[in-house]
Design a protein with these regions (language model features):
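Conserved alpha/beta-hydrolase catalytic His-Asp/Glu region
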Residues: 125-130, 145-207
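Gly/Ala-rich beta-loop-alpha elbow adjacent to hydrolase catalytic centers
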Residues: 92, 96, 100
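Conserved HGGG/HGGXW glycine-rich cap/lid loop of the alpha/beta-hydrolase fold
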Residues: 9-65
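Active-site loop/oxyanion-hole signature of alpha/beta-hydrolase fold enzymes
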Residues: 40, 49-92, 260
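Catalytic active-site module of serine/aspartate enzymes centered on a nucleophile-bearing elbow/loop
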Residues: 237-270
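Short beta-strand/loop motif that positions the catalytic acidic residue
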Residues: 208-209, 215-217
């Protein structure tokens, strides 16, 4: 997998296919495999780039210069500069949408179209922020994601009632279990705190181009409920698509629906 050095650390990324560039921004705690169905579908006619978050997949630790989601947006722009890519179509899910929207606000000339999936540009509600911070403290103290926490954290990402014996669930649970103490303390926990203490940028959303922006959300997304997506689509003035039979990682829970929606949107905008 290709690598770029950004802010002194190796950032690994997928680069597959040719044509207009589509950048896929991943969720926290997921590596490039989160987008496997979309990489396959989109790379038939687009150049698909998937940067792996710091401390995830093969990417290096969170650079010391990373203090906010704006820094994640800036680091992605640095990657695009290194690759001599002037304009992109950006699809961001969860934190991928959080930094993705900030990138679009920071450098609108670089964004051809924008899809915000299962994400929210407001601040984290105080109750859930405190809850996630309590989980981070437990992980930090243990130097691991303790066994009892695995089946607390993993279900957050899926629709209620997912088969916990399914490969999708078990593979993700195993990945959580496999994080080293060093990776958790250097990258995963600090990045999580950065994400969930983010600033509210809802008032800036009307600056986004409604004609080239789409909001999508899993109908059964627990951490980022559809009401948040409805609020954002209203502020932007863009279309909203609810994804049936899907929770937070909608790209994996209903990949055929997501692929069709993305291909249709990109055909009209990319």
């Amino acid at each position: 997998m290709p690598v770029a050095v950004i802010d002194g650390q190796p950032l690994h990324y997928v680069d597959q296919g040719s044509g207009p560039v589509v950048v896929l921004g991943s969720s926290y705690l997921w590596d490039r495999d989160m987008w496997a169905p979309q990489i396959d579908a989109l790379s038939q006619q687009y150049r698909v780039i998937v940067p792996e978050l710091w401390g995830h997949g093969e990417s290096g630790p969170l650079p010391a210069s990373t203090h906010s989601l704006d820094d994640l947006a800036r680091q992605t722009l640095a990657l695009l500069d290194q690759l001599d890519i002037p304009q992109i179509n950006l699809v961001g899910l969860s934190v991928g949408g959080m930094w993705g929207a900030r990138l679009a606000l920071l450098a609108p000339e670089r964004i051809n179209s924008l899809v915000l999936m299962d994400t929210y540009l407001g601040a984290e509600p105080e109750a859930t922020r405190q809850y996630y911070f309590s989980l981070f403290k437990m992980i930090e103290d243990a130097g691991a994601i303790p066994e009892p926490l695995l089946d607390v954290v993993a279900p957050i990402f899926f629709r209620p009632g997912i088969d916990r014996e399914s490969a999708l669930y078990q593979d993700f649970r195993q990945q959580l279990q496999g994080y080293s103490k060093e990776r958790l303390l250097q990258s995963i926990v600090p990045l999580g705190r950065l994400i969930f203490s983010r600033e509210d940028v809802l008032e800036q959303l009307p600056k986004l181009d409604a004609d080239t922006t789409l909001v999508m959300c899993g109908e059964q997304d627990k951490p980022r409920p559809p009401a948040e997506s409805e609020e954002m689509a209203g502020l932007i003035g863009c279309s909203l698509i609810l994804i049936p039979q899907a929770g937070h990682i909608s790209a994996r829970e209903n990949p055929d629906f997501v692929n069709e929606a993305l291909l249709t949107f990109l055909a009209n905008n990319a």
